[in-house]
């Protein structure tokens, strides 16, 4: 195995998805350091050799090492994979900026938009770090538990640097379980991963109200159209939204109850408040925050996104689920 393949990786973020990606990398034979912002919890992970809070009974591979010191976590590697909630993405970049050297390369698997602005995370990264570091994004239909268990999974990888993309594809890709597709459309890959969370809330609301499979499928289909329109306004490639980071992630998130966003929507459709639903889920529901950012971005771009708009009205303006459904179903007749 060449040095390119065996170079170590640091994963920043020890939640379910960050841990799962660290497990997948380590299982593939690469020295992997996993860092989290709470040293006492990282000490438990190091002792138990698993993340029982998020991925119980899935043992860490020998190549996975817990690192609670951020300085060391950055100093030991060239390649950094950030897997934190979108609302702290900028904070993590600000933390690591003084620790970076010219050789570092940054990738993230965070799905979302910048809080209160709707900006793509690539824009945030370039604003904080400048343009001297190769950047990449990993996105697609991946539930953390299945990935950590080694079940077959496929994902998309896009980068500003073709060499970085090629090397990370070869490092992550595992012919037995984890397939990585390269995509040169960073805008589309980021956008698909963020907006699908909002549509998944809508699908959950629909199912929670008992509207059935026909309505769910219509929401997914029209949701994809909304994502594609927004992507076109930002210069994304329309083909991206038919791939892993678009349709793939959208279908997965809208149809399986492993999705926090879908479960959140289900509870809303059943009459629970947003606060009650989030408390019951007990983890970050990215789509709750992404809804506001997606709505802001659509307004900025002048793009019509009725599903996103109605979910925004429900979450942030007090509109109830029945009125949301009535508004969507009562829209004027139009061509597809």
Swiss-Prot record:
Pathway: Membrane lipid metabolism; glycerophospholipid metabolism. NCBIfam families: PRK00094.1-1, PRK00094.1-2, PRK00094.1-4. Catalyzes the reduction of the glycolytic intermediate dihydroxyacetone phosphate (DHAP) to sn-glycerol 3-phosphate (G3P), the key precursor for phospholipid synthesis. It holds the Pfam family NAD_Gly3P_dh_N. Sn-glycerol 3-phosphate binds at residues 111, 140, 142, 196, 249, 259-261. Coiled coil: none annotated. The keyword Lipid metabolism applies. Its EC number is 1.1.1.94. It catalyses: sn-glycerol 3-phosphate + NAD(+) = dihydroxyacetone phosphate + NADH + H(+); sn-glycerol 3-phosphate + NADP(+) = dihydroxyacetone phosphate + NADPH + H(+). NADPH binds at residues 16-17, 37, 111, 144, 260, 284, 286. This is Glycerol-3-phosphate dehydrogenase [NAD(P)+]. The keyword Cytoplasm applies. Gene3D superfamilies: N-(1-d-carboxylethyl)-l-norvaline Dehydrogenase, domain 2, NAD(P)-binding Rossmann-like Domain. It is found in: Cytoplasm. InterPro entries: 6-PGluconate_DH-like_C_sf, 6PGD_dom2, G3P_DH_NAD-dep, G3P_DH_NAD-dep_C, G3P_DH_NAD-dep_N, NAD(P)-bd_dom_sf. HAMAP family: NAD_Glyc3P_dehydrog (MF_00394). Belongs to the NAD-dependent glycerol-3-phosphate dehydrogenase family. Its main location: cytoplasm. Keywords: Cytoplasm, Lipid biosynthesis, Lipid metabolism, NAD, NADP, Nucleotide-binding, Oxidoreductase, Phospholipid biosynthesis, Phospholipid metabolism. The active site is at residue 196. GO terms for cellular component: cytosol. It comes from Actinobacillus pleuropneumoniae serotype 3 (strain JL03). GO terms for molecular function: glycerol-3-phosphate dehydrogenase [NAD(P)+] activity; NAD binding. GO terms for biological process: carbohydrate metabolic process; glycerol-3-phosphate biosynthetic process; glycerol-3-phosphate catabolic process; glycerophospholipid biosynthetic process. It is an enzyme of class 1 (oxidoreductase).
